Amino acid sequence: MSLRPLPLLVVPGLLQLLFCDSEEVIHNTESVDWEDRTVPETLVGNLFHSRITSPLRLFVKQPPDPKPSYADNTKNFWDWLANITEIQEQLARTKRRPIVKTGKFKKMFGWGDFHSNIKTVKLNLLITGKIVDHGNGTFSVYFRHNSTGLGNVSVSLVPPSKVVEFEISPQSTLETKESKSFNCHIEYEKTDRAKKTALCNFDPSKICYQEQTQSHVSWLCSKPFKVICIHIIFYSVDYKLVQKVCPDYNYHSETPYLSFG
């Protein structure tokens, strides 16, 4: 028995009927309203767009923002730094200096502000100081001095037993009972130096270089304490000064201490 290949009969009308039936099945199962679009209407395109309406809207890439310039970055940095610095200073003042509205913390010592001005041929010195009572048993003393010319300046807090002298003697180094109970220490210190040109004092026709120094010192004191004094040491080419200033026991006085040398 021999097998013979059967001929394949192709009926064009039948294939067209099958193709149309399959397309109708897809439309009926999806039940999606079609929209007008520029995509070629093919079977694959119909299948893709029937599931996602306007798919290009979901993947639209926004245009990139213009890159900020160097000046904009610098301005933003300084604005941020100024805001951060202002916030930190406010927090520091809030922690260290609580608001006290009662009158009993108004005056703790006989003076509040300190001012000293020293002028010589070689140096011009201005020292200012201020006491701030925190109301919680502690207080701060802030010093600032500006000098123009040549010289060394030292401003500090000492107990009343501190000896006023130019040279340090062996007796002055001995600690007394009062100095041991002196609970004050430096909390902050900063010094800035610069040079400028000006007319010479000895010869106005010439130009001399002058050194400018600005210092900020902050002291913090706590109990127990009785009396504190400001100790100033100043050395220059033509002038020497050692001065101790103590507060007045008449704490009702509102007049600040003024010293001119």
Curated annotation (Swiss-Prot):
> Which UniProt keyword terms apply here?
Glycoprotein, Secreted, Signal
* Chief location: secreted
Which GO CC terms are listed, alphabetically? extracellular region
Source organism, top-level taxon: Eukaryota
**Which segments carry the region annotation II?**
23-87
Region (III): which ranges? 88-166
Keyword Glycoprotein listed: yes
Q: Where is this region: IV (linker domain)?
A: 167-175
Where in this protein does the record put region V (Cys-rich)?
176-261
What the record says about family reads:
Belongs to the neurexophilin family.
Q: Return the PANTHER family for the record.
A: NEUREXOPHILIN, NEUREXOPHILIN-2
What is the protein name stated in its UniProt record? Neurexophilin-2
Query: From which source organism is this entry?
Result: Mus musculus
- List the gene name: Nxph2
